[in-house]
Amino acid sequence: MSDNIEIYQDIAIHAIESVFEGEYHNTLGIPMPQIKILMPDDADYITGQYYIMIDDTWQIHLNFGKLPISFKEFEDEVKVLTRHEIEHYMCCPFDVITHLRMLKCIIDVYKKEFSHLGIDIQHACGSISNQAADIIVDTKNYFRNPQDTLVSEINWIKKGANIKNCPRHSKLMFLTKEALWGTSLEINETDHELLGIVRDLAEKFKVNGIEDKASFLNKTKEYARTFFSLYIKDQLSPNDDGQQGSQSQQGDQSQQGGQSQQGGQSQQGGQSQQGGQSQQGGQSQQGGQSQQ
């Protein structure tokens, strides 16, 4: 077992170096990711936990859970995760100020239009912000590395709960990526009203280009508005499988908001939802700065 772990650690190190050196040419100015192999008794073992701290260091943490049998599959996944976290630093939110402004946008939308829902918005805003940021960075990475990004996204969805049984608002991030990428993520959504809402949201993410930093706040507002509207629909009319939207279902798939906040620092990125506060900073939460 220990020998295998060392092999996987070596593969991870080489894959990370290939991204930092081969794709970003050692120009990032952030430390190399810290890696860890999680044990089966760890709460995040099935999905792993991946995030970047949004602070002065922008330290990436890659905590790998259940490992694939194929070394090549693992190597490809490490590269995808590394690119994902790097792009939270390079693209969205890009800096601490933008991260905090994205959180404020979501809080403002909630307080002005949806405060009657009774959601703990200070707790939830990080996850929602991380979802919006993930759409942006994953779409950028999809157009740069389509096959690797697509395979990783499909596998990630399959690691979570059965997405067909998830409420509408919990599918929003994945369906929006599917619409933007123009290719199937094997979600096989049949709710035509929901698909129309997603198409409209995807068009708003396309305005001025997916990477336009001046548009990030507007895109975050539109995502939050759509998210809360779908949340209401889920409360009033649960899907056919009887799954009712609840506040805890914002990341039914432990993949949504890799944003969880630790120690007051926000982290973004990974794709796993951690009960606390979300951290972006990749891909979730406030104050701090970390993203998943």
Model-derived segments and spans:
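Short, functionally important secondary-structure microenvironments
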Residues: 1-292
